[in-house]
Amino acid sequence: MRAVETIVRFSRLEPRLRLLATEAVLNLARARLAIRLLPFRRAIDFGAIPLGEGRGEDVGAIVRSVEAAAWRLPWRSVCLDQGLALQRALRRRGQDARLHYGLTAPGSGPLSAHAWVVLDGEVLLGGERAGSHCSVAIFPAD
């Protein structure tokens, strides 16, 4: 039943949002494959593409499309999948989105990793856990 509802909702979206949703699903799938099949350094390059031409698109709509698609996919999309997918979509549109990769601070509990996306100093995705992690790398590096 959930699949049918998702298809019906998708068909009711305005064309611009339908295109964003399709791009989000494709980027999430490609990011997941890159993470599973490639060495980390090559996989991380999936999102760190050269900046495209700016189109003045609604950044919030792009973020929401990645978040919504991640919830509806038949596999679990983790923060790194989502971060790479969002970073790629934004950079393609000329937005200098940066993917931060962080680890929990020493002595603050078990080691865990997290990824979040920052644009112009604002955390767009993954911010709910970013505060408990220390950024150890930013992609692309300056």
Regions from the PLM with identified roles:
Residues 93-107:
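Short, well-structured beta-strand/strand-turn elements
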